[in-house]
Amino acid sequence: VEEAYYCESCNFSKFLVDCHMVLHECELCYECIDCEKIYGSSYLQSSDNCSACAFGFDLKGCRNCFACAGLRHKEYHIFNEPVAPDEYARRMESFAVGSFEEAERMKREFAQWILRIPRQFARIRQSEGCEGNNIFNSKHATGFDVFKCEEGKFLDWAQEIKHCYDMLATGRPQWCLDCVTPDSSFRVLFSNWCWQCSDILLSDNCHSSTNLLFCSGLKHKKYCIFNVQYTKETYERLAAQILEELATTPVWGNLFPAGSSPFAYNETVAMHHYPLTKDDVLARGWRWSESLPFTTGKETIAMANIPDAIVDSSDDILTGVLACNACARNFRILAPELALYRQMHVPIPRQCPECRYRDRLALRLRKKLWDRQCGKCGKAIRTPYASERPETVYCEECYLKEVY
């Protein structure tokens, strides 16, 4: 990724601000979520191969579309209705100045309008025997944000895995179980951040190693227990004894307990995905921080003094400190960030990066499945759209008939 600011889980893209899961040749994107091959667009979600679009959901192969959803290979549309190119340009004039008030108004209007558009039960593309959401080019995989995976279950942000179970944030592991980021590893079990390893158990942050048990921070090592080097024969004998005893305890078969994390719960992204109160966290035996790294009350520029339109902005903002409209945290605008706002004709944000990140996550569906029925044919479906949500949800067959 090049020139990306306040983004998460983005790759092979450049010139991005406030994006989440923007992948594969995206450029000049602002507030885009779950998109691929997007150029010069803002406020898009679950869209592919689009350019010069704004406020869109599930668009494919579209250009110059504004406030549209479920369109395929369309151009010059507003709220899913075709308009002449000159009329489109005229109606976009007010938005082109990068007005904050206009952008906020459009967010509200689009959120209400889009409820009338049916949603596909899940975003699963070119895959076979898969269940979850945001799954692409995979076979017999269950999970969320899954790319080119085979024979895997309970996967989260996984790429090119084979025969793995309970994986988080990883690429190219094989035959691994209950791990975080065992990238390019083979037979790694119950371990965290062990890359390019094989035959590793209950270890943390070990790289390019093999045959380790209860180790941490090792590189280019083999036949170690608790970071102590053994011969191959001694390692195999001791490891067999330890594992036989471990098999009778609750430790065996699980990754390290969350309470052993060096980070407080509210310091991590877990707080955004699965928010808990302080009492809930402490009751589970986990850490809670009372001193998160931010300041308040040190602002030097009042939000009321920031021009509504980006075309009226001054470089003076680069030397000032702002206060978030939502949480009062202080934040600053960076020079390359401001340049991208101007280039993309989007307004200066009034919220801090943390609150903007929270709002983006709120637009994504939860990583959980519900049993529902297709809103058109009544077929049983497993979907990340909770039953109480207001959207109309269609099975794959009914949705494809709707959009093609």
Residue spans for each PLM region:
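Long, distal/terminal scaffolding or interaction modules
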Residues: 1-404
